């Protein structure tokens, strides 16, 4: 891989990593689950489709049961009540199964986040640890600085991948902060407490 490609690729990964950090892993998991719930029934996910159907039936039965007097139409009310209890039990069982699916979706989302952010960083850090991304002209920087930006495995005068990762991470963090700052909740202005006569 060419050095300039590494430069761009690492910077993009750092941007994605900062965006994920700003949005929050839990928010991404929630979005993933909502998308899964919308898409899965279209591909024959029986649990979600059955749960939606039974929930609709439960609302219908509950409405009919409320409209029937237990004293005047006891047999009909009892039948509706049994249907109601049966549907509630079935929905609870389906909910447990759906909760297990949610755990699987969240686990998959976590793996996907790791694949997109952490794993590439460690791979490049090991595989391209001695690659010089670019050079500074000799004498333009102090000798100690030239030596430090080449750490840990690059020749003096060159910029190592590790240093570029830190620089790209800092820039990505600053850009994310500047973008997210207008959307942050306003901090209330502090009010000075009035001093009592005894404190004066």
Curated annotation (Swiss-Prot):
Give the source species: Meyerozyma guilliermondii (strain ATCC 6260 / CBS 566 / DSM 6381 / JCM 1539 / NBRC 10279 / NRRL Y-324)
Query: Residues on the Cytoplasmic side?
Result: 27-113, 176-200
Tell me if Cell wall biogenesis/degradation is a UniProt keyword of this record.
no
Q: Which residues, by range, are in coiled-coil regions?
A: 75-107
What is the official name of this protein in its record? Golgi to ER traffic protein 1
Give the gene symbol: GET1
- Superkingdom of this entry's organism? Eukaryota
Question: What InterPro entries does the annotation carry?
Answer: Get1 (IPR028945), Get1_fungi (IPR027538), Helix_hairpin_bin_sf (IPR029012)
Principal place where this protein is found? endoplasmic reticulum
* A Gene Ontology term for the protein's cellular component: endoplasmic reticulum membrane
| Stretches in topological domain Lumenal | 1-6, 135-158
GO BP term (any one): tail-anchored membrane protein insertion into ER membrane
Family (UniProt): Belongs to the WRB/GET1 family.
